[in-house]
Amino acid sequence: VLSGSDLEPGLYHYSPTEHALDILLPSLDKKEVSSIWMSQRWFRKSSIILIMTAVYRRTTDKYGEKGLPFPFIEAGHIGQNIYLLAQSLGIGCCAIGQFKEKQLCKLLDINPFEEYPIYYIALGN
């Protein structure tokens, strides 16, 4: 969350088992976060950036190699639903393709060999 929300600015993690948001970082350095996405124009107007990550073992342990594309497919489904919801609410929405992987993994405090960011959506006006 960057600005303009009922939530305080910060980095949050969605817990699907508890259907709740946990705060990971209570504040964000907007310059540092901006540099991850190379100060792209859309970033200046974004209020929220959603970041989806994949833990590949969750699908490959169950499905073997066939499970490798499943996180991408599911992220695409989620992304499409976010686009539809944003459209109905009149909120700007843009999927993000260009970013600095190492910096983002460091910000999220994740090991890129176990969990990897796979889909990003900026929301705002």
Functional labels for PLM-detected ranges:
Residues 1-125:
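Acidic, surface-exposed loops and disordered segments
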